[in-house]
Amino acid sequence: PSMDWIREFLATPVNHVPGTAFMYNSTGSTFLGAIVRKLTGLGLHDYLKPRLFDKIGIDADNLRWLTMPDGMEVGGGGMFATTEDNLRLMKLYADGGVWEGERILSEEYVKLATSKQNDSASERAVNPPAEDNFVGYGFQIWMCRPKGVYRADGAMGQFTIVFPDRDMLLAITENASGSTGGAMPQKALDTIWEWLESLPDATVETLPEDVAASEHLARRMEKLALASPRRSPESA
């Protein structure tokens, strides 16, 4: 894009009546970031740090953003974060916009964002060829083939999936790229859906607390986790 990408975006012809067709578009989301900057005088990083990242435990100084030619952070993708960062964000949605007792997102917004607002990818010729791209789209969040399941979906298979009926989240960071486009990440989703079908029905009963097992799991997770690398210039 050029330095005048905002003007070019606004001058792009609209081929369909608004609300009648879905075409994957990242510039539209980046334009929302430009609106935030216009209204607040802050870029996305500086705006979100005290309002979101700090509140849900994301180390904002460790994030890396791709930028537009005018220096604004890309709003439609290009933020490099850890798997745990992604999980924290979608945990906020899974809990209805509340984090440790503090409301961060409105309940109404979360309900709309995580439910079908349009028939996604209505033109298959210009959308990634993956079955889970044709289930529906909320506000920056994709619906999934298993009923009630939704996901955040980044480039090359960065998925954070919410299973509301099971009170469960699953975050994946991978590099599923190739000439087949969306078909590569779709294989990961297909595998997850097969695994989901093999699970017993979710129970509505609360299991008794098992302190010993919980402590064992915490110790195990500490050994599995990798320390977040500090942000630094790219190596040669």
Named regions from a protein language model:
Residues 3, 60-63, 111-171:
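Active-site Gly/Thr loop motif
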Residues 1-77:
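Catalytic-site signature segments of enzymes, centered on catalytic residues
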Residues 180-236:
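Short, gly/Ser/Thr-rich active-site loops of penicillin-recognizing serine hydrolases
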Residues 28-35, 75-98, 110, 158-175:
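Active-site-proximal alpha-helical segments within enzyme catalytic domains
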Residues 53-115:
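Active-site-proximal binding-pocket segments
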Residues 6, 10, 33-37, 45-49, ...:
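Non-transmembrane alpha-helical segments in soluble domains
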Residues 18-22, 73-78, 149-156, 176-183:
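Active-site rim elements
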